[in-house]
Structures are given as C-alpha cells and as structure tokens.
Amino acid sequence: MAIEGLMKQGFVTTSLNNVINWARTGSLWPMTFGLACCAVEMMEAGSSRYDLDRFGIVFRPTPRQSDLMIVAGTLTNKMAPALRKVYDQMPEPRWVISMGSCANGGGYYHYSYAVVRGCDRIVPVDIYVPGCPPTAEALLYGIIQLQDKIRSTNTIART
C-alpha cells in the first residue's frame, strides 16, 4: 500500500530521472566540428589548463560515439549538408553547442553569399556561446549551462 502511494506521487520516476540525468551530465562525449578560428579555442579548452576530464568530457573521433556536437566557426553553404549528416549519425539523446559569432549568426561574414547565417538553420542548437572567438572559459561556461539544462529535463515521462 505504501509503495503504491509513492508511485502515484511520482516518487520513483522522479528519483530515476535524477539518476539518469546525473549520469548523462557526468559523461558528455563531444564530437568536435571545428570550422574556423573558434576551433583553436575549443582545442585550448581541451588542454590540461582547463581539464575538461573533470567534467567527464572525453572528445570522440566519430559521431556514432558522441552525444554532444560543438560547432565552432563559420559554417558555409557547402559544409552545411556535411554538418547535418554528422548530426544525424549521432545517437539520441544528442545536444549541440554553437560556439562563436559565426556559428551563432554568421558573424563577420553574415552578408556573404556563401555563409549560413547561424548553424541553428541546419541543426537544433541547445547552447549558444558568444564571442569572436569565444575564450575557453566561455566554452566551459556553456558546457556547465548544458549540464544544468540536462539535469532539468524530464527523461522518463515526457509531458
């Protein structure tokens, strides 16, 4: 009788949600999609000075092993189909961080005929990291914001 009361209140599913989201935030495996100068700052964030390993972040070489894509730099019209193809190869759940002014909205090259004005026109973006180029600290802050977003999602019972 007591367990049925807990089940009706959603206690068990809420606790399971917390455990699943905790595990997801502690094991983000990003796939780097470096397109321009922002990729240098993304590589800097992976260095020993910032130590992304303490957040459980391990860069993966293939999209089939990753659950986070970091788009860093200017996305051109010619590269957009490749970005979408790589995104489609990632397993669910998957997240995208758009890093830099060019990836967010075209940046300096906004009025160029060959530039996509924001990678959110190609793939759904979860976190935007502003800057030209954004610092490694800004990317680290964006990753922390993504972890907070993952913790607040409802994984088991979607409403």
From Swiss-Prot:
Q: Name one GO cellular component term.
A: respiratory chain complex I
Q: Superkingdom of this entry's organism? A: Bacteria
Its membrane topology is listed as:
Peripheral membrane protein
This protein's UniProt keywords:
4Fe-4S, Cell inner membrane, Cell membrane, Iron, Iron-sulfur, Membrane, Metal-binding, NAD, Quinone, Translocase, Transport, Ubiquinone
Reactions catalysed according to its record? a quinone + NADH + 5 H(+)(in) = a quinol + NAD(+) + 4 H(+)(out)
Tell me where in or outside the cell this protein is found. Cell inner membrane
Record-listed [4Fe-4S] cluster binding positions? C37, C38, C102, C132
- A molecular function (GO) term: iron ion binding
Q: Which GO terms describe its biological process?
A: aerobic respiration; electron transport coupled proton transport
- The enzyme class is translocase
Cofactors needed by this protein, per the record, are: [4Fe-4S] cluster
Query: Which Enzyme Commission numbers does its entry carry?
Result: 7.1.1.-
Which Gene3D superfamilies does the UniProt record give? 3.40.50.12280
* Cofactor notes: Binds 1 [4Fe-4S] cluster.
Provide the family line. Belongs to the complex I 20 kDa subunit family.
Q: Which PANTHER family match?
A: NADH DEHYDROGENASE, NADH DEHYDROGENASE [UBIQUINONE] IRON-SULFUR PROTEIN 7, MITOCHONDRIAL
Q: How does it assemble?
A: NDH-1 is composed of 14 different subunits. Subunits NuoB, C, D, E, F, and G constitute the peripheral sector of the complex.
Its annotated function is as follows: NDH-1 shuttles electrons from NADH, via FMN and iron-sulfur (Fe-S) centers, to quinones in the respiratory chain. Couples the redox reaction to proton translocation (for every two electrons transferred, four hydrogen ions are translocated across the cytoplasmic membrane), and thus conserves the redox energy in a proton gradient.
Q: What is this protein identified as?
A: NADH-quinone oxidoreductase subunit B
Provide the species name: Ruthia magnifica subsp. Calyptogena magnifica
Phylogenetic placement of the source organism: Bacteria, Pseudomonadati, Pseudomonadota, Gammaproteobacteria, Candidatus Pseudothioglobaceae
